[in-house]
Amino acid sequence: MLKKAIIKLLGIDNYIEKIEELEGERKEIFENFEKLNKKLDNFENELNFIKKEIERIQLEFNNVINSNNNDYVSKKELNDIVNQLNTLSTLVNGLIINISHGNNLKESSNTVDDVKNRLLELLQSEKDYCITEIN
């Protein structure tokens, strides 16, 4: 009670309320920033999975092409590879849709590096926004 009276007498009660309000906003901003970091980690894991799948499919394709001394590659082997590439394409498109939801990611950005760079740009813009909000 005495503390409140002294604060009121000094005329800083409004400042203290504003500081407490800003502290609450700061905590909320940092919580949102942490959520964004987790989302970025998830996207990075998905990108790494896609990259490994691309490498695996490339290796399998090379093995099929190099088998049988290049005399004959069965239609089934090629269809299997095409199906794997289609599945991978679906994964990449799904990831791009997830990333671009609420953001303006160009549809032409369909390579792993483009998506990863765009994610880093989004994270940086969120960092800048958080810093602006704190200040």
UniProtKB/Swiss-Prot annotation:
Can you name this protein? Answer: Uncharacterized protein MJECS04
Phylogenetic placement of the source organism: Archaea, Methanobacteriati, Methanobacteriota, Methanomada group, Methanococci
Q: Which Gene3D superfamilies match?
A: Nsp3, SUD-M subdomain
Alphabetically ordered keywords of this record = Plasmid
User: What InterPro entries is this protein classified in?
Assistant: NSP3_SUD-M_sf_bCoV
